[in-house]
Regions:
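Amphipathic helix-loop-helix modules that constitute alpha-helical solenoid scaffolds
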Residues: 85-139, 146-183
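Structural recognition of an alpha-helix C-terminal capping motif at a helix-to-coil junction
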Residues: 36-43, 56-68
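Short, charged helix-capping/linker segments at alpha-helix termini
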Residues: 1-9, 19-38, 48-56, 148-149, ...
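Hydrophobic-face residues of short alpha-helical interaction/recognition segments
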Residues: 18, 22, 62, 66-74
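Hydrophobic/aromatic residues within well-ordered alpha-helical segments
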Residues: 11-14, 66
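DNA major-groove recognition helix of helix-turn-helix
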Residues: 38, 49, 66, 74, ...
Length: 183
């Protein structure tokens, strides 16, 4: 498998897991950051792997590169300077490779966060398909026969509501679970 095909495969099958893990570690208010740094890591893989070779565990490499990029960006953000120690404390959770059950728990928590009842159903669906399933904005728009700009706006508004309502990626309580599963 050539590098381009491998990176495409990793994007389709691992990017949601990495986004979920980073969102758990850095908090749901940094969902945009998690998505951006995963894309940065995939780009770095495309740039480096053809020359340096594919690492033994490509998904772990992507996670580490994305985590390090997120830390770099957060450290340089003046408004988050007070959070630097908190972020450093979260690092041990990523130090050892997560088991597949941890990754599944993170993905489920991400899906349940995307399906928070504070978000309109259209936002929940678009955000889940984009963030947890890895579909592009264009793919989501085609599936729902909706203009791509509409889907893009739903995603922006959904992420803004998550940030503004301080919605966390933790699993919901037993009372809140049915409302999210219905979504």
């Amino acid at each position: 498998m050539n590098t381009d095909s491998l990176v495409d495969h990793l994007f389709r099958h691992h990017s949601a897991k990495i986004v979920a893990t980073l969102t758990r570690v850095f908090g749901s208010r940094h969902l945009d950051l998690a998505e951006d740094v995963v894309q940065d890591a995939l780009l770095k893989a495309l740039q480096q792997w053809p020359f340096k070779g594919v690492p033994e565990n490509p998904a772990a490499w992507l996670t580490l590169v994305a985590r390090n990029r997120a830390l770099d960006l957060l450290r340089h953000d003046a408004t988050l300077a007070s959070k630097a120690q908190e972020l450093e404390l979260a690092l041990p959770r990523l130090a050892s490779p997560a088991s597949s059950s941890d990754e599944m728990d993170d993905q489920l928590a991400l899906i349940l966060m995307c399906c928070h009842p504070a978000l309109p159903l259209e936002y929940q669906i678009a955000l889940t398909l984009k963030t947890a399933c890895g579909f592009s904005t264009a793919e989501i728009a085609r599936a729902f026969l909706t203009p791509q700009t509409t889907v893009a706006q739903r995603l922006v508004r959904a992420k803004r509501q998550i940030r503004d309502h301080d919605i966390v990626i933790d699993p919901p309580s037993a009372d809140d679970l049915p409302a999210r599963i219905d979504s």
